[in-house]
């Protein structure tokens, strides 16, 4: 198993998620919301984890189906946990399980929510919640595919890991 390429891709995903969190952070500044600090803290955490993972390109770029499965699974886990942190840190959804549920619901475009009245949330949190749905709508696979040049041409294995059972031959 080529762990270096897996962690390298996860590092880039963390950095991209941090970039996506800048818009809600800017929204917080515009509206004068203190919830914006939740995004600042989460951006710092994402970058603190992502930058070291991408510091050095992996020397071995082999990326096969098993690495694809691990990368996709870890991507979902990392995106969901990091995406839930602004909800938790802002106090909008203080229960971590509920925050992760809300985030996973957004990234998977499920549409389920634990929130009875989303309009009471701060603007920056609403933007982030909408962003998770948008990212999910464009597809986490497309999000990850932007990183495929890093795999040295082994991206078909990542696509095999993400496709559904009904398409598997």
PLM features: residue spans?
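Membrane-proximal intracellular helices of multi-pass ion channels
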Residues: 1-169
């Amino acid at each position: 198993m080529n762990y270096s390429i897996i962690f390298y891709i996860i590092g880039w995903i963390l950095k991209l998620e941090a970039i996506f969190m800048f818009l809600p952070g800017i929204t917080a500044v515009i509206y004068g919301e203190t919830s914006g600090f939740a995004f600042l803290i989460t951006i710092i955490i994402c970058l603190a984890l992502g930058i070291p993972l991408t510091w050095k390109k992996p020397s071995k770029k082999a990326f096969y189906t098993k690495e694809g499965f691990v990368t996709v699974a870890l991507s979902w886990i990392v995106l969901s946990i990091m995406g839930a942190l602004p909800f938790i840190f802002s106090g909008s959804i203080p229960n971590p399980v509920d925050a992760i549920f809300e985030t996973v619901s957004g990234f998977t475009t499920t549409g389920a929510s634990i929130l009875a009245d989303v309009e009471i949330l701060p603007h920056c949190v609403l933007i982030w919640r909408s962003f998770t749905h948008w990212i999910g709508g464009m597809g986490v696979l497309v999000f990850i595919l932007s990183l495929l040049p890093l795999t040295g041409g082994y991206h078909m294995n990542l696509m095999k890991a993400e496709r559904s059972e009904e398409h598997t031959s």
